[in-house]
Amino acid sequence: MKKLSALIFLFFLTLISTVNAANFVEGMEDVPLMDGLSQITQDDISFGNEETRLLEAYLTSRRLKFAAVANFYRESLPQLGWIYQGNRGNNLLFYREGETLEIIKESVKPLIIRITVKSKP
């Protein structure tokens, strides 16, 4: 009976971990994925080494507006250490420990945004 209980516990622990992992942009464990956005994974870019990195992800939604997405990231990213630097047109800029994060509106209908994380040399 104890073995069965342990197996059930491990199953639920794995399930919870999988659900939590789904709440972040794939490949960017420090960038949350807003409800209503889905990731276009075939367009992701990821490369780097011990000193620098470049990550790029595309997200899309047919029902969200960019203003709601911008508000979500302005509120949530500072909780993960990102410091909001302001807007540059339709771009949101954040900075954290030698890295920049940029959120760019690529299109309106459907909404497509690009999130880029770059290390500063």
Please place each PLM-identified region on the residue numbering.
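An acidic-aromatic pocket/loop used at catalytic or ligand-binding sites
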Residues: 2, 20-121
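Bacterial N-terminal signal peptides that target proteins for export
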Residues: 1-8
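Bacterial N-terminal signal peptides
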Residues: 8-16
